[in-house]
Amino acid sequence: NLMQFELLIMKVAGRSGIVWYSDYGCFCGKGGHGRPQDATDRCCFVHDCCYGKVTECDPKMDFYRYSSNNGDIVCEANNPCTKEICECDKAAAICFRDNKDTYDNKYWNIPMEGCQEESEPC
């Protein structure tokens, strides 16, 4: 669920998902249209695509289980659908961490008019 995603981002990337990623670029926080503006926005685009492939449960609401083993996140496999959600969130959190250096404040809270291009396929 979204609260778990926030906690996972904090654990992996060391920053708040709500503060840093809830309104960034064309895909972080608002659903998504257009083309990703940078590597961070692409993390959100890929995350949106990943959530789009989850059909048997609700990625924004359903609870999943994971553990941390020497800093690595391990999604539990008790329920295949919630494991999928966990894997989506884990990949995004790692992507945010790996692209911290490219984060650009100019993409924070950009007007949606800047996101009108046709979206690329997932």
UniProtKB/Swiss-Prot annotation:
Write down the required cofactor(s). Answer: Ca(2+)
Q: Where does Ca(2+) bind?
A: 27, 29, 31, 48
GO BP terms, alphabetized: arachidonate secretion; lipid catabolic process; negative regulation of T cell proliferation; phospholipid metabolic process
What is the active site of this protein?
47, 89
This entry's Enzyme Commission designation comes to: 3.1.1.4
Q: Which UniProt keywords apply?
A: Calcium, Disulfide bond, Hemostasis impairing toxin, Hydrolase, Lipid degradation, Lipid metabolism, Metal-binding, Platelet aggregation inhibiting toxin, Secreted, Toxin
Query: In terms of domain of life, where is this protein from?
Result: Eukaryota
Location in the cell reads: Secreted
Give the UniProt tissue specificity note.
Expressed by the venom gland.
- Give any Gene Ontology cellular component: extracellular region
The SS bond pairs are 26-115, 28-44, 43-95, 49-122, 50-88, 57-81, 75-86
Secretion signal, residue range per the UniProt entry:
none
Cofactor, how bound (note):
Binds 1 Ca(2+) ion.
Stated role: Snake venom phospholipase A2 (PLA2) that inhibits platelet aggregation induced by ADP, arachidonic acid and PAF. Acts in a enzymatic independent manner on a proteinase-activated receptor (PAR1, F2R) to evoke calcium release through the inositol 1,4,5-trisphosphate receptor (ITPR1, IP3R) and induces mouse aorta contraction. PAR1, phospholipase C and IP3R inhibitors suppress PA2-induced aorta contraction. PLA2 catalyzes the calcium-dependent hydrolysis of the 2-acyl groups in 3-sn-phosphoglycerides.
This protein's assembly is summarised as:
Monomer (predominant). Non-covalently linked homodimers are also observed.
Q: Can you tell me which family this protein belongs to?
A: Belongs to the phospholipase A2 family. Group II subfamily. D49 sub-subfamily.
Q: What is this protein called?
A: Acidic phospholipase A2 5
* Organism taxonomic ancestry: Eukaryota, Metazoa, Chordata, Craniata, Vertebrata
